[in-house]
Amino acid sequence: MSEDINKIQANMHAPFGPMLMEFKMPQPYIDMLNTYGDKISASDKKSKQLDWSDNLVGNVKQEHKIEDHIWHEKPNENLPSLFNWMGACINLYVKTKLKQGDEQDNAVAEKGIKKVALHNSWLVNSIAGDFNPPHMHYGQLSAAGWLKMPESVAKDKERERAGWIEFLYGNPAMW
């Protein structure tokens, strides 16, 4: 998987257990996903076809599965596909995490990852009153992103309370 670490803007956070890495998504990918999401929301037929809410835990009115072809699209000629950009971010995360380990982990980190398997992806269009309760995501890595923020959240008094995400860590008890 190709990777240009110099073009990926990332910050590491380690508040507890697993390392969190915050990435800055380039604007062309944001624009591509927003255009895609807006087209789905504008079409009742497409919105129903891609409705993913039965597979998710939240109380959210618009949750749409991202079709596989979107991951392979490029926002322009100069950028890799969304999947390849995300793969480069994942590679950076894995290398950074492994380099915190022992000598054997460092050797593995230098090789990088060879394959990424994407299990599920969806867009959530949150509106006033929507919420997601605490829940688990299964798999090795999870990602979340914000593509649009209402002006009231970006500038007004709501800024300090709205649009938050909370990460919890632990193993599910099976009893």
Task: Identify the function of each model-found stretch.
Residues 2-110, 129-132:
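Non-heme Fe(II)/2-oxoglutarate
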Residues 16-18, 116, 138-140:
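A general secondary-structure signal for short beta-strands and their flanking turns/coil
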Residues 97-117, 137, 153-159:
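Short acidic alpha-helical/loop segments enriched in Asp/Glu that coordinate divalent cations
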Residues 119-175:
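Catalytic core of non-heme Fe(II) oxygenases with the double-stranded beta-helix
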